[in-house]
Swiss-Prot record:
Pfam families membership: YidD
InterPro entries, per the entry: Membr_insert_effic_factor_YidD
Function: Could be involved in insertion of integral membrane proteins into the membrane.
Name used for this protein in its record: Putative membrane protein insertion efficiency factor
Record localization: Cell membrane
Source organism per UniProt: Oceanobacillus iheyensis (strain DSM 14371 / CIP 107618 / JCM 11309 / KCTC 3954 / HTE831)
Cellular-component GO terms for this entry: plasma membrane
S-adenosyl-L-methionine found in the keyword field: no
UniProt topology in membrane: Peripheral membrane protein
Keyword Ribonucleoprotein in record: no
Swiss-Prot/TrEMBL keywords: Cell membrane, Membrane
Family as reported in the entry's similarity comment: Belongs to the UPF0161 family.
Length: 90
């Protein structure tokens, strides 16, 4: 299952992303984050982390550095997921 999600992300990166403006507010990009999260935690947990990350990628969120966490204790714990975000305070 995780190879399907990885394939979808790679398809997006090669076939769709080149034709859209670069707009990710985070480092690493949402697709890089998704690949790492799914490779590290599998399709379910990595997929949930990726969906939560993509849902934060909008003009009203400041963005910043948001790396995949080392461990996922409780996937529903927003405080745990927000800990890795370093905001741009320009």
């Amino acid at each position: 299952m995780k190879f399907i999600f990885i394939g979808l992300i790679k398809f997006y990166r090669s076939a769709i992303s080149p034709f859209t403006p670069s707009s990710c507010r985070f480092y690493p990009t949402c697709s890089e984050y998704g690949l790492e999260a799914i490779k590290r935690f599998g399709a379910f947990k990595g997929g949930i982390l990726t969906i939560k990350r993509i849902s934060k990628c909008h003009p009203f969120h400041p963005g910043g550095v948001d790396v995949v966490p080392d461990k996922v204790k409780n996937i529903n714990n927003e405080k745990h997921l927000e800990k890795g975000v370093i905001r741009n305070e320009d």
